[in-house]
């Protein structure tokens, strides 16, 4: 019996070492007035973060390289940050848009691995090759469609509307194939 327990412990230890590193998001309010929004982002992440990461990795075929990401909750334009620069997330979004925004901004961080791309594909067009499909996998087509409409209404910083129209003019299979081409460009460039 003791030998069986020892073997079980060794198996569990080896299994946990073989698991991929968990992506942790550390949410901080920019000021006290964003405490509630910060708690909501944290609650979403605690409940759904693992599923989000799994869906993003499965659909994109990429794996997150980071293990810890700082996220500041404030009232301004959401931004993925980069390396040591924290992610910044808008406080006033409703819960559904907060979920979509987390996936969107994490997608930019995931895409750091695919810097080489055809000239006609900017960073959002690359992201949109799989973002809709991740949202669909996580929350269904209705949610994904609603979030596309939310993003299409954003004006000034980027032309989300034409980027989404372009991405969704392709079938799911065409988007996936195009994204694989981008990934392949980056793999062939590694030594």
Predicted regions and their residues:
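Post-HExxH zinc-binding segment in Zn-dependent metallohydrolases
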Residues: 114-163
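Short pre-active-site segment immediately N-terminal to the catalytic Zn-binding motif
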Residues: 85-102, 118
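Pan-zinc metallopeptidase signature
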Residues: 152-191
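Bacterial N-terminal signal peptides
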Residues: 5-16
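Active-site recognition of the HExxH zinc-binding catalytic motif
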Residues: 100-113
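Boundary at the C-terminal end of the N-terminal hydrophobic targeting segment
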Residues: 18-20
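Extracytoplasmic/secreted proteins, especially bacterial periplasmic and envelope-associated proteins
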Residues: 51, 55, 97, 101, ...
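Auxiliary, metal-adjacent structural segments of Zn-dependent hydrolase domains
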Residues: 25-85, 138-140
């Amino acid at each position: 019996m003791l030998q069986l327990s020892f073997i079980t412990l060794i198996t569990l230890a080896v299994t946990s070492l073989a698991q991929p590193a968990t992506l942790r998001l550390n949410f901080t309010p920019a000021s006290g007035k964003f405490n509630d929004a910060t708690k909501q982002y944290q609650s979403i992440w605690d409940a759904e973060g693992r599923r989000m990461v799994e869906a993003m990795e499965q659909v994109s075929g990429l794996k997150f390289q980071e293990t810890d990401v700082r996220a500041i909750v404030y009232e301004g334009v959401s931004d993925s940050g980069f390396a040591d620069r924290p992610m910044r997330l808008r406080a006033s979004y409703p819960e559904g848009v907060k979920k979509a925004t987390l996936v969107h901004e994490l997608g930019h961080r995931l895409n750091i691995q695919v810097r080489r791309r055809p000239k006609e594909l900017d960073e959002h067009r690359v992201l949109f090759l799989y973002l809709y499909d991740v949202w669909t996998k996580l929350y269904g087509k209705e949610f994904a469609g609603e979030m596309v409409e939310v993003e299409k209404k954003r004006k000034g910083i980027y032309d989300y509307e034409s980027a989404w129209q372009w991405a969704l003019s392709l079938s799911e299979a065409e988007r996936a194939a195009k994204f694989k081409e981008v990934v392949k460009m980056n793999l062939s460039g590694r030594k």
